[in-house]
């Protein structure tokens, strides 16, 4: 892992989803790159921990904690995290309202054209662009950072020597960093992956504050 992506060019993505695959025992990131291609990226538990460590290490600098007395750090982080998640909830509601309005404008069921049936199981179809993430590169700005991933093409890399390729880069503002931390923790809980993290400023996604505690350790 290095701090700058150097001369390698990475396709940018600003839209992605994430789910846990019990079959792969990995998180699968499905991203739409700005060049129009869709890519699937496999994240191992080790790689997820690396991403989380980098996000948490950069967060104090991104949020200006260095200018804040250490005694107030947890409170500032908690307020920033709650604000970021509230913004996401508002954006999600707006998207849901737009989708509901679009569905309301569709023709009645009797007039609708028959659509092609979707695959019953998404794992039955191997994505055209599938990579195993093996390297994370981080570039930090004043109030933003970019995560860039390299990896091996799958399943080709399992049967023959393959070159490491740039998968995509994700530009993140401060709110996005908080939202990604929450998303990764949520998916790791679903995967039942133990996270050696303590983050008292973040509410566990399942609301189970009694059994799961996350607090940030400063070194």
Residue ranges and their predicted role:
Residues 2-65:
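The feature marks the first
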Residues 38-99:
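Acidic (E/D-rich), amphipathic helical modules within compact regulatory domains
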Residues 149, 154-209, 218:
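Mixed-charge, glycine-accented linear interaction segment located at domain edges/termini
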Residues 2-29, 83-161, 215-216:
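Intrinsic, low-complexity N-terminal interaction/targeting segments
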Residues 70-81, 128-140, 196-208:
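DNA polymerase processivity clamps
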Residues 33, 37, 41, 65, ...:
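Alpha-helical rod/repeat scaffolding segments in eukaryotic adaptors/tethers
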Residues 64-75, 97, 104-114, 190-202:
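Short glycine-rich, low-complexity/disordered patches
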